Amino acid sequence: MAPPAAVSPPSRSAELATSTKLPVMSKNINTKTVEEMLGQWDDFKFAPIRESQVSRAMTRRYFQDLDNYAESDIVIIGAGSCGLSAAYILGKKRPDLKIAIIEASVSPGGGAWLGGQLFSAMIMRKPADAFLREVGVPYEDEGNYVVVKHAALFTSTIMSKVLQMPNIKLFNATCVEDLITRPSEEGVRIAGVVTNWTLVSMHHDDQSCMDPNTINAPLIISTTGHDGPMGAFCVKRLVSMQRIEKLGGMRGLDMNLAEDAIVKGTREIVPGLIVGGMELSEVDGANRMGPTFGAMALSGLKAAEEALKIFDTRKKQNDL
């Protein structure tokens, strides 16, 4: 006699979703404007809610995003000024592409929330002022350079534009632990990223059973910054993978040499991996640029341009 077939119990999802009576929406809750609320605080009241509604609203959307972006078109590692600039151009030029941004910090923006030595103003040398006009950030013209009154104005502006694009998803508090690879004629091709919660990655030495997750993508743009706890991650991994012999090491500060070198050098380092921003200085041995941000923005633009040139080729390879 054959063993009994396994039978799944009836689904209770619908029952659980409807078993608890939810608060009734007030009829006039949607009629309020800011002007109507001002001066009426004695009668003020939020719309009713149940705590489970909040949990489900967050959880459902996040897991839907994880599912949607498990197969992405382009992954950008690092949401600093370079990564966000690249995302802006890609999202604008190719709204058909699914673009995932992975940021290790809770707060995107990298070092672009302040200028040098924790001062407020952001300096960009011309012609990077063209990008400020593109995204609508006001500035003071000082001849060869421009000044944004607070660096946070640039970062918050470009971030808000990028996050409103329907084809872009930011996964912050998430870090890239490794790269997905495939054999190719060039030796190896990068075909995605291995991700984990940042706090989990920071505790691999004292915890166990914390395997990562993955995102497949035919093209990765790495803009993780110069060497540091999370910086220059991809190029350091390429060394350990023996895809590049060694890091060039960032040189001393020279704004005039550094910014030109970073923008011009932004490129695909190995098949499927474009490197931009200060991470590139660790490969090429470029100079440090200090508190001037024009090259970060324009390196992002060039990274996006390079990505669009090679995307179709890498996607065909990825589909094989």
Swiss-Prot record:
Gene3D superfamilies: 6.10.250.2840, FAD/NAD(P)-binding domain. GO terms for biological process: thiamine biosynthetic process; thiazole biosynthetic process. The keyword Phosphoprotein does not apply. The keyword Cytoplasm applies. Its cofactor is Fe cation. It is found in: Cytoplasm; Nucleus. The gene is sti35. Disulfide bonds: none annotated. HAMAP family: THI4. Substrate binds at C82, E103, A104, G111, V176, D211, H226, M278, R288, M289, G290. Induction: Repressed by thiamine. Induced by ethanol, Cu(2+) chloride and heat. During the catalytic reaction, a sulfide is transferred from Cys-209 to a reaction intermediate, generating a dehydroalanine residue. Keywords: Cytoplasm, Iron, Metal-binding, NAD, Nucleus, Stress response, Thiamine biosynthesis, Transferase. One of its GO terms (cellular component) is nucleus. This is Thiamine thiazole synthase. InterPro entries: FAD/NAD-bd_sf (IPR036188), Sti35 (IPR027495), Thi4_fam (IPR002922). It catalyses: [ADP-thiazole synthase]-L-cysteine + glycine + NAD(+) = [ADP-thiazole synthase]-dehydroalanine + ADP-5-ethyl-4-methylthiazole-2-carboxylate + nicotinamide + 3 H2O + 2 H(+). The modification 2,3-didehydroalanine (Cys) is found at C209.
